[in-house]
A protein has these predicted regions:
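Feature activates predominantly on carbohydrate-active enzymes
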Residues: 40, 47-50, 54, 82-86, ...
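C-terminal non-catalytic alpha-helical accessory regions
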Residues: 446-696, 700, 718
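N-terminal secretory signal peptides that target proteins for export/translocation
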Residues: 1-11
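Terminal, low-structured helical/coil segments at or just beyond the last alpha-helical repeat
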Residues: 702-726
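Extracytoplasmic/secreted proteins, especially bacterial periplasmic and envelope-associated proteins
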Residues: 43-46, 50, 105-108, 112, ...
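Catalytic-core regions of glycoside hydrolase
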Residues: 62, 181, 197, 201-211, ...
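Conserved, mostly hydrophobic/aromatic
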Residues: 102, 140, 175, 293, ...
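Acidic, contiguous N-terminal accessory segments
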Residues: 12, 16-20, 28-93, 123-126
Length: 726
């Protein structure tokens, strides 16, 4: 993508933006601009409104009709000359023409021009710009806080926020600004909140006024999404109904909230209720684009073929019954047997592919076949190691599919409080996994976190955000913009730091890229599967029945996620036998050097940033420091783990002393994390603390300070160790 006025060097970026911002504001005084939509649509009106807001902030008088203005911006669609979702910005004299390949591209063009103006470009300095999407599907997975997949106060605390339409307006604004194009709303049972199914009024728990409130919420979310050019989907888990339906008919006794792991109820009542609910939902919500189906929880006791047939006969048939265009997300099965336990199988892959291909072209556009990339912990290695249940064969890819495309879900179950941003990880991910002709795009999102209520911020000073997603603006901007165009340069993201915080923040993107790589390296080193098996920013993992700090013993024994990484156990065992590792393998000493190099450089980059005048900037810098110290903690812990395992395999007492020394240093870095985070972060409810239980755990507060005792135990583990104790 050509970025026009943002094509500046990193060195000169801050000064460039400050100078241009000042000049642009002065020049704009007393000038008027007409922002015109010759072919008015809700999307053109939205793009014009957002652009007009920026122009007004820059000091222009904005008009919506030609009244002899000094400047004009014309918004138009030309499907003949641009790809869908593409746009061009063409300046000529006092007229700037924004052309979209469709209405969505038109919005992107308007927002791109607004971004130029916000970053200081003067009207007459706008240069020709064009862009088109790299990937067709760029979605956010959003788990709703009602009828949630799991019971937890970490999720239910968002209930009121997620019913606030002002919140949704801001969230959807963020999505389109970052060029996401689909919002997918996930919960166990969406239909109870959306319709009163005609033949099953007893299934609804609501009064008329209560149901009207729920329906207004959904209608407005879908309307606002459509206005912003966003596709909308509801996604759910197979056989779940309302408690009221289950109790009225004596069916589905464990297939309603808070149950989420039960046997499949294939009774005629449940089949009819769900098929009719799907149909009625699509009929009553014309702005809803599609539905996503799952073959997982709520289907225990059914074989893979029975699950697939049930989905076809009930859910997919309900969509087709609606007699209107519908888009389909078809998730790959999670289990290969009759239980709900995870499992991958080529036979199930063949069964699923054949079923999807039988659907032909009955759904609008390609069917999006959703696959979890590296299970629940996609912010690890960009190498595809596993999906939900195990390794994935090439069944879905070879031969090239004709009516569907694969969409990867990169889940985040690892960092909710600390801000994250590693642009080169995303670029590499797309380069490795997003360029194949069978790939349609990506989801990003979480199962154990909802980006709604800000339950993190402890300081009372004013900050620049109201809701949780606004704290993580860099995460969303990086993923959204790079999925649209992986060639988007870092200067685009650096410019946002400077615009928000001034020239002193110019180093923050680089600092985040270095410091928050700690998450990627931890999750590449420490193998994980489902949601609770790792919580990166807290160095927690599911161990037995509970979620706890990753002890030195657990770190030694744990296999790696990335096959290029070498575990402590394998490293020490190989060296003790006189072996070695090929070039390209990431051994513990190499990983230690990487962690320390990047953490120390990140700390250097933020060391001189003055945060005294901005609580928001203080948080940005503090999160860099927290990630960096987590990296330094992990580095010392790895050194201690190698020394301890060497001692246990027959090393000398010096190895034991070395292990104790390094683990004491690791504790000091943890104390530094506490020093950074205790004053500014609340104790935070964490879904992972449910552990292996399917019930909510009320004792679920996390803070780095709360687990210091677990961290300190590493030193005692080393002191108590004996040779031969493995």
């Amino acid at each position: 993508m050509q970025i026009g006025s943002l094509n500046v060097t990193v060195k000169n970026l801050a000064g460039h933006l400050l100078l241009l911002c000042g000049l642009a504001t002065a020049t704009a005084q007393a000038q008027s601009v007409a922002v015109l939509c010759p072919q008015p649509t809700p999307q053109c009106a939205y793009g014009a409104r957002k652009l007009s807001e920026t122009l007004t902030e820059r000091g222009f008088t904005v008009r919506s009709a030609r009244t002899d203005p000094q400047r004009e911006v014309i918004l138009a669609v030309s499907r003949d000359h641009l790809k869908p979702e593409g746009f061009s910005i063409t300046p000529k004299g006092g007229v700037i023409t924004i052309t979209g390949g469709d209405n969505r591209g038109l919005i992107y063009g308007a927002l791109a021009l607004a971004e130029m103006f916000r970053n200081g470009t003067r009207f007459e300095e706008v240069t020709a710009t064009h862009a088109s999407p790299s990937l067709a599907f760029r979605a956010i997975k959003y788990n709703l806080p009602w009828s949630t997949y799991r019971p937890s106060s970490a999720l239910s605390q968002h209930y009121d926020t997620a019913r606030d339409l002002k919140y949704w307006e801001a969230f959807l604004d963020m999505m389109v600004e970052n060029r996401f194009n689909a919002i997918t709303l996930w919960n166990l049972d969406p239909f109870t909140y959306m319709v009163r199914t005609k033949n099953f009024p007893e299934a609804s728990p609501w009064s008329e006024s209560q149901l009207a409130q729920w329906q207004h919420l959904y209608h407005e979310i879908f309307r606002m999404a459509k206005e912003r050019g966003l596709d909308t989907y509801v996604v759910f888990w197979s056989i779940f109904v309302s408690r009221q339906l289950a109790q009225a008919h004596g069916v589905a006794k464990e297939n309603y909230y808070p149950y989420y792991y039960g046997s499949g109820d294939t009774s005629a009542i449940v089949r009819q209720y769900l098929r009719e609910s799907v149909k009625q939902t699509l009929e009553e919500y014309p702005d809803l684009d599609g539905i996503g189906v799952s073959h997982g929880e709520g289907m225990g006791g059914m074989t893979p073929s029975q699950r697939q047939q049930w989905v076809e006969d009930v859910l997919i048939q309900g969509m087709l019954d609606a007699k209107r265009p519908v888009k389909l997300i078809h998730r790959v099965p999670f289990s290969s047997g009759t239980s709900s336990e995870p499992g991958a199988s080529q036979d199930v892959e063949k069964l699923t592919r054949a079923a999807i291909e039988r659907l032909g072209n009955r759904f609008q556009g390609p069917i999006w076949v959703e696959v979890k990339f590296n299970w629940s912990h996609g912010h690890s290695t960009p190498t595809l190691v596993k999906v939900h249940g195990g390794a994935l064969s090439d069944t879905y890819f070879v031969p090239k599919p004709t009516n569907y495309r694969i969409v990867w879900t990169v889940r985040n179950e690892d960092f909710f409080a600390l801000r994250w941003g590693v642009p080169d990880f995303i670029r590499q991910h797309i380069a490795l996994n997003g360029v194949q002709d069978y790939v349609g795009g990506y989801f990003i999102g979480s199962e154990t976190y909802i980006p709604a209520l800000d339950y993190f911020t402890a300081v009372k000073a004013p900050v620049d955000w109201k809701w949780a997603f606004q704290r993580q603006w860099l995460f969303y901007k990086l993923w959204g913009r790079l999925l649209y165009d992986p060639k988007t340069p870092d200067t685009v993201f650096q410019a946002d730091f400077v615009r928000r915080y001034g020239p002193g923040a110019a180093n923050l993107l680089k600092a985040y890229s270095l410091a928050s790589s700690t998450q990627l390296r931890l999750a590449s080193l420490f193998d994980s599967t489902w949601d609770f098996t790792l919580y990166g920013e807290g160095l927690l993992a599911l161990q037995g029945e509970t979620t706890r700090y990753i002890s030195v013993d657990r770190l030694i024994k744990q296999p790696t996620m990335d096959p290029a990484y070498v575990s402590v156990n394998d490293y020490v065992a190989t060296l003790s036998k006189g072996g070695s590792f090929d070039t390209g393998r990431v051994t513990p000493p190499i990983l230690v050097n990487m962690l320390e190099r990047d953490a120390n450089e990140a700390l250097r980059l933020v060391n001189d940033i003055d945060t005294s005048g901005s609580a928001s900037l203080m948080y940005e810098v503090a999160d860099v420091k927290a990630w960096a110290n987590l990296g330094l903690h992990l580095a010392e812990k790895l050194r201690g783990a190698v020394a301890l395992q060497t001692y246990r395999l027959g090393g000398g007492e010096e190895h034991k002393r070395e292990a104790i020394d390094h683990l004491q240093r690791a504790l000091k870095y943890w104390d530094e994390i506490i020093k950074i985070t205790r004053p500014i972060y609340r104790d935070m409810p964490l879904t992972h603390y449910n552990g292996n239980s399917r019930d909510a755990n009320d004792d679920n507060l996390f803070h780095w300070a709360r687990i210091r005792g677990e961290v300190a135990s590493d030193v005692e583990i080393a002191r108590a160790s004996r040779r031969g104790q493995l």
